[in-house]
Structure formats: C-alpha cells, structure tokens
Amino acid sequence: MSIFRFSQREIIDLTISVLAIAFIFSYPNFSILVFIISLIAVGSGFIFHELMHRTVARKYGAWSEFRAWYEGLILGFILKLVFGATFIAPGAVYIYKDYLTPEENGKIALAGPLTNVALAFVFFILMLIFKPGSLLYWIGIFGFHINLFLAGFNMLPIPPFDGEKVLKWNPFIWAIVGLPLIGYMLYMMFW
C-alpha cells in the first residue's frame, strides 16, 4: 500500500482531528491568529506524528490508516470549555498485519515521537531566524515546545502510548530517547 494513498474516511478524520486540536489549544484566547498559530504548530506535530506511524507500518507490509476517536474529541471540547483543561485524544493509526515482530512494532511506535523531535528542531530554527515578537517567531516557540511535549507524552512507558512498545522492543533505546523527552515534558508541566 502506497504511503501517499489516503482513503476518503482517513482524509475526513485527519481534517476534523487537526481542526479540533487547533481549537482546543487556541481556546480560551481564541482569535483567528491564535488559531492559525495553533493549527501550524500543533496541527503539524499531530499530522506528521500519525503519518509517520502509518508510513513505517506500511514499510513493514502492514495495512495502516488513521481513524479519529470522536468520543475523545468531544471529551476534549467539553473539558476545555467547561474546566479549561487541555486533553487531546483525537485518534490513532490502526495497524493490521498477521504478525509484527517486537522490533517492527517498536520502530513503528518510535517513528512518531522522533518526528516530533525533528519538527521541534525546525520550529527552533524559526525562533532563531525571525525577530522576537513576529508571527513566525511565535509559531517557532509554540511549535518547539509543543512538539517536544508531544514526543515526551507519547514516550511514556504505559499502554497505549508509543513508549510502551519501544520499551518492550529495546529498553536502551527507550531510555536514551524517552527519558530526556519525558523529563522535558514534566519540566513543561510543572515549571
């Protein structure tokens, strides 16, 4: 299955999920500008994270496709609107193959958080290039922090997160990738 082939349902699910996530991250200070910053910074992190899982799974001969979890999106809206809490559980890439080795499963899982790290680097470059206070500078700051946060969150070593699959496959790789990212995530949460 080609990595560039998307079903109509997958396109709809990805679109609805990314718009919902952008809204959740832009509320309560919602404006078109804040929404656009959120869409670029958070939306790109979410989309590329999920599509990298999908791409690596297809490399291993598995059928894979993103499916939205509409209940999770609704819960995210309710928690944000009622309590001001940010919760995102937009869906996941569903993977089907008769058998995936622990190594294949671990590499599929690791692909998402590593993509967020790569995106964080790109956003960091934006922060360095553009003048503080400019739109691209703010996109850079938000994109840098949120992508490292997403990578750390996904590397938690508990099901259903990516970190659990990586740890089962290779504890050393989980430690050198996951621990710094989880540390950064915790720093962001409590600093």
Swiss-Prot record:
CDD domains (UniProt xref): S2P-M50_like_1
Membrane topology: Multi-pass membrane protein
Transmembrane domains' residue ranges: 20-40, 73-93, 110-130, 133-153, 171-191
Keyword field: Cell membrane, Hydrolase, Membrane, Metal-binding, Metalloprotease, Protease, Transmembrane, Transmembrane helix, Zinc
Ligand binding (Zn(2+)): 49, 53
Location in or out of the cell: Cell membrane
Active site: 50
MF (Gene Ontology): metal ion binding; metallopeptidase activity
Major localisation: membrane
Domain of life: Archaea
Record has Cell wall biogenesis/degradation as a keyword: no
A GO biological process held by the record: proteolysis
Cofactor note: Binds 1 zinc ion per subunit.
GO cellular component: plasma membrane
Cofactor(s) the protein needs: Zn(2+)
E.C. numbers: 3.4.24.-
Protein family: Belongs to the peptidase M50B family.
PANTHER family referenced in this protein's UniProt entry, alphabetically: ZINC METALLOPROTEASE MJ0611-RELATED (PTHR35864), ZINC METALLOPROTEASE YWHC-RELATED (PTHR35864:SF1)
Name of the protein described by the UniProt record: Putative zinc metalloprotease MJ0611
Organism expressing this protein natively: Methanocaldococcus jannaschii (strain ATCC 43067 / DSM 2661 / JAL-1 / JCM 10045 / NBRC 100440)
